[in-house]
Amino acid sequence: MGNREMEELIPLVNRLQDAFSALGQSCLLELPQIAVVGGQSAGKSSVLENFVGRDFLPRGSGIVTRRPLVLQLVTSKAEYAEFLHCKGKKFTDFDEVRHEIEAETDRVTGMNKGISSVPINLRVYSPHVLNLTLIDLPGITKVPVGDQPPDIEYQIRDMIMQFITRENCLILAVTPANTDLANSDALKLAKEVDPQGLRTIGVITKLDLMDEGTDARDVLENKLLPLRRGYVGVVNRSQKDIDGKKDIKAAMLAERKFFLSHPAYRHIADRMGTPHLQKVLNQQLTNHIRDTLPNFRNKLQGQLLSIEHEVEAFKNFKPEDPTRKTKALLQMVQQFAVDFEKRIEGSGDQVDTLELSGGAKINRIFHERFPFEIVKMEFNEKELRREISYAIKNIHGIRTGLFTPDMAFEAIVKKQIVKLKGPSLKSVDLVMQELINTVKKCTKRLANFPRLCEETERIVANHIREREGKTKDQVLLLIDIQVSYINTNHEDFIGFANAQQRSSQVHKKSTIGNQGTNLPPSRQIVIRKGWLTVSNIGIMKGGSKGYWFVLTAESLSWYKDDEEKEKKYMLPLDNLKVRDVEKGFMSSKHVFALFNTEQRNVYKDYRSLELACDSQEDVDSWKASLLRAGVYPDKSFTENDENGQAENFSMDPQLERQVETIRNLVDSYMSIINKCIRDLIPKTIMHLMINNVKDFINSELLAQLYSSEDQNTLMEESVEQAQRRDEMLRMYQALKEALAIIGDINTVTVSTPAPPPVDDSWLQHSRRSPPPSPTTQRRLTLSAPLPRPASSRGPAPAIPSPGPHSGAPPVPFRPGPLPPFPNSSDSYGAPPQVPSRPTRAPPSVPSRRPPPSPTRPTIIRPLESSLLD
């Protein structure tokens, strides 16, 4: 039974399944399947058993199928079954198959009617089946029993939808003929996921159990309640047949005899029964497989491309080749050197867009981090001026000097140059760490050989640390060279003359009033900016207030905020001095004041301007900045150290001018030194560390690897890598084979066009007003009789009224006479006691009227309520 094309097609699909099941990827490859959907006791399991030709599925009342059963039928000379959870075990007794299904179901769901979405995978080999893959799903129910949860209806629905929503799943909607087809939950679920009806095939079971005098002819002919793929009727064995040991072969013969002998079905007997259902499914499966092949091929090609680059390295792997390890070692070291160079020097191909490479990070160290460390090394202005003052006084000793001593300048400059050692050595440490990180990233390619990876990393890291020491020695030497000779004749150095002139300009204040904006740019250089609180003015106005202050060489201005758009006032620095103010008892601020030596008002009606900071360090810093602008402390408020310590700021104008001169000289010379150091340190690191490490890797690494350990030990492959290589090669071959199989399928098969769409709106409107279903009984429920052709039979049979019990024989009654039908012959030879159908037009004379309504007597029983109402 079955067609030869399908017998050639499905083994190819099964080969696809087998190829990927071995790799654990069958779940990722959505191969076409057929899902059997229906209500409880609809005959789903019986349909499956007819395919297999054996009794092997559990039977009983209520919910029997409690887990999805994935059934793969394979044509074979021998007859046996295999479970995925019992690999290698063949079941030749199908009673054992039934017991194993029940036992496996109970292992997961328990023994009290519980359900689970975990499928049972069963493959049946038999000469009596076609090659098909089907899924038996739990029957649709609404009332929970046993251990079933209250939402059993929704759980089963979700489980069914999990399978039938896949676009590559054909839906076998099973509905008993003795129930209302219009309310079939199976067809409604299929309609939800397959609105076009391209994947849905209707199956009508229990045709032999319909009430006498009724049939499902109009449904099977797809005239009433149509589906795009139509319906196939089947007759399954009854429980009595099973108890009587009626085998499948006898059941098939009985099914064939039923359709040939039944007057309503014998003209379509060749399109009914399990054999025809198998052929229909095979053809639909063929079409579906061919339709899904393009997407399937794209998926396989995508997987193949994703691993092809990696597999390329494994293709030429020959474990038996004695020179393999030597070649591999040379290739690995060469690749490591290339990777290291690319990460340091940069590369135009395969640019990493996720993180900075080692070379880019070193560039940031050279041009961002190192200059920042130098700038961060700020001079304490107050401390620096004190040191300059001490140096001048100590050089003069007991004498009173007339000139600014250059030895004080050299002493201060040398001390500041030595401070550059810290940032310079720190930059060496940062570059060394980045080189080691780069080596670790490059050795990831050597991870397949653990010992080689470990030795390479160790040897190169040791060399980097060795070069680190030599680089630091050279950096310290550069600093010492700068300390050894102070070149005051440098072209960029301002010299003593310019420094003294600049210092004298600080003391010569021009009386320009409040016109600082007209000064030349050199006089408008900002010395300091920051927030200060004006305390004495704010007290009279209800509280102190903060302003943004800007100090230049000529004025002190304050603004509303740091955007410097709204200027409040600009105070000239002429004749101003600074003094300390005692902190108030309740105040947390530190205050200093500016006042005019000529007893003039500083700001409006105020003789002094009291400014507050959050800390004493801020006060000292502002006072030092004011000193640079020429605002000196008041003598009367200068505190002397009684323990022999010198005063913080000398009030000797000559000394202050000398301090300012040396301060300017120190600034000028240190800018020259900083520029030189910022240029030389990166060059030194580049030459002694980075370039040296690159040369070492290219020229000496291989020799040191050979001398450090035996070659065979170095090139021992990790177990994980060997397994991974074998797995990748197997995957690669399986993907290539799968693509070849797809090509074979396209060659040996032909698609058949889908049938035209039909009006299946009855599925959408059945909730509101279900139409009469001929699969239960034909009912004459119209308010007025439809016009019929004339008939010679006389009045139509009566509509029987329902008896007191649903199973009691009906009592017929006759309505008024109907118009006669045009023909009187009965082409179906119905028995005399059952009125037969009216004859239809011969095939050669097409009828212009719709098919006449049936005239056989029908039995009226109460309508079954829809499961979806």
Swiss-Prot record:
Against InterPro entries, the record matches this protein to: Dynamin (IPR022812), Dynamin_GTPase (IPR001401), Dynamin_GTPase_CS (IPR019762), Dynamin_N (IPR045063), Dynamin_stalk (IPR000375), G_DYNAMIN_dom (IPR030381), GED (IPR003130), GED_dom (IPR020850)
Q: Which GO terms describe its molecular function?
A: GTP binding; GTPase activity; microtubule binding; nitric-oxide synthase binding; protein serine/threonine kinase binding; structural constituent of postsynapse; type 1 metabotropic glutamate receptor binding; type 5 metabotropic glutamate receptor binding
Q: Where is the GED domain?
A: 659-750
Q: Which reaction does it catalyse?
A: GTP + H2O = GDP + phosphate + H(+)
G4 motif: region residues: 205-208
The record's section on Gene3D superfamilies has: Dynamin, middle domain (1.20.120.1240), P-loop containing nucleotide triphosphate hydrolases (3.40.50.300), Pleckstrin-homology domain (PH domain)/Phosphotyrosine-binding domain (PTB) (2.30.29.30)
Residues where Phosphoserine occurs? 769, 773, 853
Record's GO cellular component, any one? glutamatergic synapse
Q: Which SUPFAM superfamilies match?
A: P-loop containing nucleoside triphosphate hydrolases, PH domain-like
| Residues noted as binding GTP in the record, renumbered to the chain | 38-46, 205-211, 236-239
Function of the protein: Microtubule-associated force-producing protein involved in producing microtubule bundles and able to bind and hydrolyze GTP. Most probably involved in vesicular trafficking processes, in particular endocytosis.
Q: What is this protein called?
A: Dynamin-3
The record lists the organism as Rattus norvegicus
